[in-house]
Regions:
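Noncatalytic linker/hinge segments flanking ATPase motor cores
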Residues: 159, 255, 263, 296-303
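N-terminal leader/targeting and assembly helices and adjacent pre-domain segments
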Residues: 1-154, 271-412
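Acidic, glycine-rich two-metal-ion catalytic cores of nucleic acid-processing enzymes
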Residues: 169, 177-274
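Contiguous, non-catalytic segments that form substrate-binding/exosite surfaces or channel walls
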Residues: 114-206
Length: 412
């Protein structure tokens, strides 16, 4: 697979779980809002039992629907890799291997989706149903005791969920990670494993004795010294085992192609590899800060993630009638305009497919534009996203942002 093909597969794997996450966040936010409006303890206990029962059913239905979607997506991703790697007349062993990888990945993804966790208002990560109950209890308790007003209590109960999304627990480290990133990482790792298996089969069938690592611009620092190089079998295996990120795994855009040493000439000259390195190091300057080309790509991804988080927050705000809705709508337009400005300045294409959130359509986008236009100047101050300051923008920059076209997520 090429770096471009890997990037496309990675985007598809990341987007796969978005509908489930966004649907559940909206559902939970709506129920927390109702819980906060109840002041009688007995009435709340009745509502709590009913809401948790309905919520559990909603979670099960959303996850079940998502599993069906995910299994179709996973099958299509593995078919894509096989189609790019196998000729029609290949024997059935590699095709059977592709089917086995597909089944294994579908099974693991089902496990991940059935083990959802979320942040509670107290800052702890709990199983989703428990976190759901904690959020409702928090909103009710704070309002009933007069500790917080209704809007503040609901905002504090819902914000951790909207900000951090649905999560899963890594078995090795015990850390919680976003479910969409956990699924993407696992799927891409399995796709990489399948590609490795196919390449090794080609290696043996052709009588090869070495490997050549592909090369691309804007390379990560840990792989830049080795890209474009040829290695004997033993040398390559030793090198790959020494890497924290093996070739073709963990968001690596490289591939290792089988070669016959001394027969297959390198695909890249030393001058071409040096130009990749020099261009990356020279990088770009934006707002007085120098980025390598690789760092610019990472910054672009951080802003894209920030935009998705703000959109989720807006959807939760709408369900809970949060008075901060306008503030978040303004923030969205500021960050969207900054995204367009950053990409144009550093020479990167905007990636609208990475900004999509299920349920956030044209109406939400238009309301965000209107809120921005009505905002007083003091509301258009600088904002921070993902730990980075983004600067307020002008009407000209807002007009430069392409009109959102996304109205939903297709299951096709």
């Amino acid at each position: 697979m090429t770096a471009e093909q890997r990037a496309g597969l990675s985007d598809a794997a990341l987007a796969m779980t978005q509908p489930c996450i966004d649907e559940l966040i909206k559902d939970i936010s709506k129920r927390v809002q109702k819980a906060g409006a109840i002041t009688d303890t007995a009435e709340y206990q009745i509502y709590r039992a009913q809401a948790l029962g309905e919520g559990k059913k909603a979670i099960e239905q959303a996850v079940s629907k998502q599993i069906g979607i995910s299994e179709e997506v996973i099958a299509s991703l593995f078919e894509y890799v096989a189609d790019k790697s196998l000729s029609p007349d290949e024997n059935g062993s590699l095709k059977r291997m592709t089917e086995a990888y597909t089944r294994m990945t579908q099974s693991k993804t089902r496990e991940l989706l059935r083990d959802l966790w979320a942040d509670t208002p107290e800052g702890k990560v709990q199983p989703l149903q428990t976190a759901y109950a904690r959020a409702m209890d928090f909103a009710f308790r704070q309002v009933a005791t007069g500790t917080l007003d209704l809007n503040t209590a609901i905002r504090r109960a819902v914000t951790p969920l909207a900000k951090r999304g649905l999560r899963t627990i890594e078995q090795k480290s015990g850390r919680s990670v976003g479910i969409e990133y956990a699924c993407r990482r696992y799927i891409m790792d399995q796709l990489g494993q399948l590609d490795d298996e196919i390449q090794h089969a080609d290696h043996d069938a052709l009588g090869c004795d070495g490997w050549e690592i592909s090369a691309h611009a804007a390379c990560a620092p840990d792989h830049e010294p080795i890209q474009g190089r040829q290695y004997g079998d033993a040398e390559f295996e030793k090198l790959n085992n020494s890497l924290q990120r093996r070739i073709g795994h963990l968001n690596c855009g490289h591939t290792a192609n089988p070669i016959i040493l001394g027969v297959n000439a390198p695909q890249y000259t030393e001058a071409q590899l040096q130009k990749f390195k020099d261009d990356n190091e020279r990088g770009v300057v934006y707002n007085g800060y120098r980025y390598t080309l690789y760092e610019a790509g990472q910054e672009q991804s951080r802003i894209e993630n920030g935009i998705r988080l703000i959109k989720r927050q807006i959807l939760a705000d709408e369900e809970t009638e949060n008075p901060d809705l306008q503030k978040h709508q303004i923030k969205l337009r500021v960050v969207q305009a900054e995204y367009a400005r950053f990409c144009k300045a550093v020479g990167l294409p905007t990636r609208s497919e990475r900004l999509q959130v299920a349920g956030f359509g044209r109406s939400q986008s238009n309301r965000a534009v209107w809120a921005y236009k009505k905002a007083a100047p003091e509301q258009l101050r600088d904002v921070e996203i993902a730990g980075h300051k983004l600067y307020s923008v002008t009407d000209e920059r807002i007009r430069a942002v392409p009109k959102p076209f996304f109205q939903g997520v297709s299951n096709k």
